[in-house]
Regions:
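Amphipathic alpha-helical coiled-coil segments
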Residues: 1-54, 61-72
């Protein structure tokens, strides 16, 4: 069982979340200066929520795979 792809998914989704956070911060700054609208801020908030959800799901999948791997490695041979 190879967990490396799942670890890469965790790393990738973490980067995506960070970029979504930056985008939201930028939209909020633009809104404060009058160069954006609440619609674009809402979109950035929605995208950040989705990115956080994707990251959480990736972490859960990775941790489950680690538990499964440990279980398989500790199982007695027949």
């Amino acid at each position: 069982m190879n967990v490396d792809p799942l670890l890469r998914r965790v790393e990738t989704t973490a980067v995506s979340r960070q970029l979504s956070e930056r985008r939201l911060e930028a939209e909020e700054r633009k809104l404060a200066t009058g160069t954006s609208t609440s619609f674009f801020v809402f979109q950035a908030q929605r995208d950040l929520a989705q990115a956080r959800n994707n990251e959480l799901l990736a972490v859960i999948d990775y941790r489950r795979s680690i538990v499964d791997l440990d279980t398989v490695q500790e199982a007695p041979l027949r």
